[in-house]
Every structure is written in structure tokens, then in C-alpha cells.
Swiss-Prot record:
Region (Disordered): 95-125
GO molecular function, a single term: rRNA binding
Gene Ontology CC, one term: small ribosomal subunit
Organism expressing this protein natively: Borreliella afzelii (strain PKo) (Borrelia afzelii)
UniProt function note: Located at the top of the head of the 30S subunit, it contacts several helices of the 16S rRNA. In the 70S ribosome it contacts the 23S rRNA (bridge B1a) and protein L5 of the 50S subunit (bridge B1b), connecting the 2 subunits; these bridges are implicated in subunit movement. Contacts the tRNAs in the A and P-sites.
Pfam families: Ribosomal_S13
GO BP annotation list: translation
Family recorded in the similarity comment: Belongs to the universal ribosomal protein uS13 family.
Complex formation: Part of the 30S ribosomal subunit. Forms a loose heterodimer with protein S19. Forms two bridges to the 50S subunit in the 70S ribosome.
Record's keyword terms, sorted: Ribonucleoprotein, Ribosomal protein, RNA-binding, rRNA-binding, tRNA-binding
Listed PANTHER family: 30S RIBOSOMAL PROTEIN S13/40S RIBOSOMAL PROTEIN S18 (PTHR10871), SMALL RIBOSOMAL SUBUNIT PROTEIN US13M (PTHR10871:SF1)
Keyword hit for Amino-acid biosynthesis: no
UniProt name for this protein: Small ribosomal subunit protein uS13
Length: 125
């Protein structure tokens, strides 16, 4: 079982799919990594030898920001927006959509479950 960037790659999948289990590597980037490391992207992950795993590891660590470092960069970027109190930072802080979507009826994913307002029907009479 290959271990890259602290993640065990799923051994029964093709390399182009197995690499997507690493945070920060999608399908396109997985193909790029395979091409740079001169490894067939359709090769099964459990068939990799140590030399190929080391080449993959070297390409990923030298050229891409992945896993913990990428997560911390994203968190720092969001924190910076919240600190400067720009529109996007305020929306992050309030837990609302950032990109102009309507919030009167939709945005349930971002806002969470509905919160019922007590005595709303009585007050509307």
C-alpha cells in the first residue's frame, strides 16, 4: 500500500483515481502528476514499486501544495477576509452564501437547519 503525503492510497484503484484521495489533487492534477513521474495513469495502485512511489512523492511534494499545508492556507485566507471585515469576510462570519445567491428562501446548506420562530403564527393575525 502506497503512502503519499500522509495518506494511504486505495490499493485496488487506478492511479489516476487513487491520487484523488489526497486533498488538493483532483482528476486533472492526478493525470499531471502521473505524466511528470512517467507512470501510466491506468496502473493499479497496489502494483506500484518503491521507485515509482518515490517518484510520485517527489513530484507531489516539490510541485504542489496538498493536505495539511493547503488546508491551513485556505483557513488563513478565510481568516484574513474575516479580519479585514470585507463583504466576503462578513458573510463567512455570519455563515451565509458569499457570491450573491438569494437567502430569503434558499441557502439551507450554508445556513443550516431551519430555526423555528416561537409564536410567529399568533403574531401574524
Amino acid at each position: 500500500m502506497a503512502r503519499i503525503s500522509g495518506i494511504d492510497l486505495p490499493s485496488n484503484k487506478q492511479l489516476k483515481i487513487a491520487l484523488t484521495s489526497i486533498y488538493g489533487i483532483g482528476r486533472t492534477r492526478a493525470l499531471e502528476v502521473c505524466n511528470k513521474a512517467d507512470i501510466s495513469s491506468s496502473k493499479i495502485a497496489k502494483d506500484l514499486d518503491n521507485d515509482e512511489v518515490n517518484r510520485l512523492r517527489k513530484v507531489i511534494e516539490s510541485d504542489y501544495v496538498v493536505e495539511g499545508k493547503l488546508r491551513s492556507e485556505v483557513a488563513m485566507s478565510i481568516k484574513r477576509l474575516m479580519d479585514i471585515a470585507c463583504y466576503r469576510g462578513v458573510r463567512h462570519r455570519k455563515g451565509l452564501p458569499l457570491r450573491g445567491q438569494r437567502t430569503k428562501t434558499n441557502a439551507r446548506t450554508r445556513k443550516g437547519k431551519r430555526k423555528t420562530v416561537a409564536n410567529k403564527k399568533i403574531a401574524s393575525k
